[in-house]
Swiss-Prot record:
The lineage of its organism: Bacteria, Bacillati, Bacillota, Bacilli, Bacillales. This is Anti-sigma F factor antagonist. Gene3D superfamilies: STAS domain. The modification Phosphoserine is found at residue 58. Belongs to the anti-sigma-factor antagonist family. GO terms for molecular function: anti-sigma factor antagonist activity; antisigma factor binding. It comes from Paenibacillus polymyxa (Bacillus polymyxa). Keywords: Phosphoprotein, Sporulation.
């Protein structure tokens, strides 16, 4: 399976929706596209929706942590939402939720980042 990336900008937030598999085959593409979007659009925050992400390995984890560090260095926040059980387990075991909040859906994430219209 491959990976689809959908990106949207909403009031200073880069919303990234991933579908498919985030692994060593697709992680570089995600990293490059997110970095370009962050630099080009001057995003303050990131919301990462994993609703349709079927699988993720340590390469995917690295992409998420790297984007977290990047946006954090700019004074922004990153949140994860819509995480399915297998991916949730990996993120939980990695300790990611100790540094990054998780929300049930995009609306809740945007509300917490105080950018809902």
């Amino acid at each position: 399976m491959n990976l689809q990336i959908e990106m949207e900008h909403h009031r200073g937030v880069l919303i990234v929706r991933l579908s498919g598999e985030l692994d060593h085959h697709t992680s570089d593409m995600v990293r490059m596209q997110m970095d370009e979007a962050i630099q080009r659009r001057q995003c303050e925050h990131i919301v990462l929706s994993l609703k349709n992400l079927q699988f993720m390995d340590s390469s995917g984890l690295g992409v998420i942590l790297g984007r977290y560090k990047l946006i954090n260095q700019k004074g922004g926040e990153m949140a994860v939402c819509d995480v399915n059980p297998p991916v949730h387990r990996l993120l939980d075991m990695s300790g990611l939720f100790k540094i990054m909040p998780i929300y049930d859906n995009e609306v809740n994430a945007l509300t917490e980042l105080e950018v809902v219209s």
